[in-house]
């Protein structure tokens, strides 16, 4: 599991680096254009109405920069969407295929969707397991034999004999913490913690929506359900 988280942390770090490079390139190009126009204005002051032209070009430049930065900022949820694709393609679908090969009937696979990333800590997951057991379920951790792209254990949940459900905590989401820290710390203020919680919730929601979309695309919606902290279905 740690190996998988290291892989996902690498993806998030790579995204942050690319985003920073893109912003720097835009800033450098815009500065170069401005300097070039100013030099031409100084060198040939009387040949063209430089003041009007530079004014228009600076407005166009500003609009273009804002548009490009807007496109970059729209990528804010890309790390969560990338994690969703990795989770479904490298773990969820192979895991379901393996379980279906073993099961004599249909299976139910539940994915836990947290309200915030702290719910995926070891301590909170342990408390969640106790809550599930308190509701009359028997729990058993099982290991998948086939390669699913990353080491991963599943929680087998049973209430009545022969009634089985598989439960997973998508801890791959924890790798988003470094991205959240980067985004919030770059504008650090007294509301940083609140911003981190709010951003974490938005990223979890983006992950959930993309996983749901991929599940429907792969015709797995009859097998997979989502549950929240209160064990209610989404």
Swiss-Prot record:
Keywords: Antiviral defense, Cell inner membrane, Cell membrane, Membrane, Nucleotide-binding, Transmembrane, Transmembrane helix. One of its GO terms (molecular function) is nucleotide binding. The chain crosses the membrane at residues 20-42. GO terms for biological process: defense response to virus. InterPro entries: Prok_STING. It is found in: Cell inner membrane. One of its GO terms (cellular component) is plasma membrane. It is a single-pass membrane protein. CDD domains: STING_bact-like (cd22659). In the C-terminal section; belongs to the bacterial STING family. Effector protein of a CBASS antivirus system. CBASS (cyclic oligonucleotide-based antiphage signaling system) provides immunity against bacteriophage. The CD-NTase protein synthesizes cyclic nucleotides in response to infection; these serve as specific second messenger signals. The signals activate a diverse range of effectors, leading to bacterial cell death and thus abortive phage infection. A type I-D CBASS(GG) system. Binds c-di-GMP (synthesized by the cognate CdnE encoded upstream in the same operon) and about 10-fold less well 3'3'-cGAMP, but not c-di-AMP, 2'3'-cGAMP or cUMP-AMP (tested with a protein without the transmembrane region). The effector protein for this CBASS system, its activity is stimulated by c-di-GMP and leads to cell death. The cyclic nucleotide binds in the C-terminal bacterial STING region. This is CD-NTase-associated protein 13. It comes from Roseivirga ehrenbergii (strain DSM 102268 / JCM 13514 / KCTC 12282 / NCIMB 14502 / KMM 6017). The gene is cap13.
